[in-house]
Amino acid sequence: MGMRMMFTVFLLVVLATTVVSFMSGRASHGRNAAASDLIALTIKGCCSVPPCTANHPELCG
């Protein structure tokens, strides 16, 4: 393989790696948002139960 071909292969590998990491980063943002929503729902559930509210006043502010 010549230098030009090796450089082309290198660029293709870098491009593919960048695209994969970009897409996986975007996918994890969705999972993080879903986890945050679940945590918020759990806290709201706790705040509606008086014993839980008494035990965790910092959550229900």
Curated annotation (Swiss-Prot):
The modification Cysteine amide is found at residue 60. The lineage of its organism: Eukaryota, Metazoa, Spiralia, Lophotrochozoa, Mollusca. Alpha-conotoxins act on postsynaptic membranes, they bind to the nicotinic acetylcholine receptors (nAChR) and thus inhibit them. It is found in: Secreted. InterPro entries: Conotoxin_a-typ (IPR009958), Conotoxin_a-typ_CS (IPR018072). Contains 2 disulfide bonds. Residues 1-21 form the signal peptide. Its main location: secreted. The keyword Isomerase does not apply. The keyword Repeat does not apply. Residues 48-50 are annotated as: Ser-Xaa-Pro motif, crucial for potent interaction with nAChR. This is Alpha-conotoxine-like Am1.2. Coiled coil: none annotated.
